């Protein structure tokens, strides 16, 4: 998990996205029929369940079900294993999706930098395979 932090400090920081900032590329870039992620739990449901701000993510509806199950079957804490599993699995999928988005952003930044470098070389007249006239003489 810390590899992106090491690459930021030891590698080229211009092609490493900041994990605390929003992505710079649109989410449907390269995926025209990609659907936008939507929250299942509404703001009112999360307020009614008194969820902390850190827990209000795309898996909040599973957490609300888990907390309700724990409340309803209080002494029997093992009764909510399926709800706990559903919430953990949703958190895992969310984490994997965020890591894929981070990697996608990193690759798009690298591609953008390569294209800018290639355009700058072509503007100077020194593209790949071309020889500078001074060197040719």
Swiss-Prot record:
A motif (Cx9C motif 1) lies at residues 59-69. Pfam families: NDUF_B7. Residues 113-137 are annotated as: Disordered. Residues 56-98 form the CHCH domain. A lipid is attached at residue 2 (N-myristoyl glycine). It is a peripheral membrane protein. Transmembrane segments: none annotated. The modification Phosphoserine is found at residue 73. PROSITE patterns: CHCH. It is found in: Mitochondrion inner membrane; Mitochondrion intermembrane space. One of its GO terms (cellular component) is mitochondrial intermembrane space. A motif (Cx9C motif 2) lies at residues 80-90. Belongs to the complex I NDUFB7 subunit family. Contains two C-X9-C motifs that are predicted to form a helix-coil-helix structure, permitting the formation of intramolecular disulfide bonds. Accessory subunit of the mitochondrial membrane respiratory chain NADH dehydrogenase (Complex I), that is believed not to be involved in catalysis. Complex I functions in the transfer of electrons from NADH to the respiratory chain. The immediate electron acceptor for the enzyme is believed to be ubiquinone. Complex I is composed of 45 different subunits. This is NADH dehydrogenase [ubiquinone] 1 beta subcomplex subunit 7.
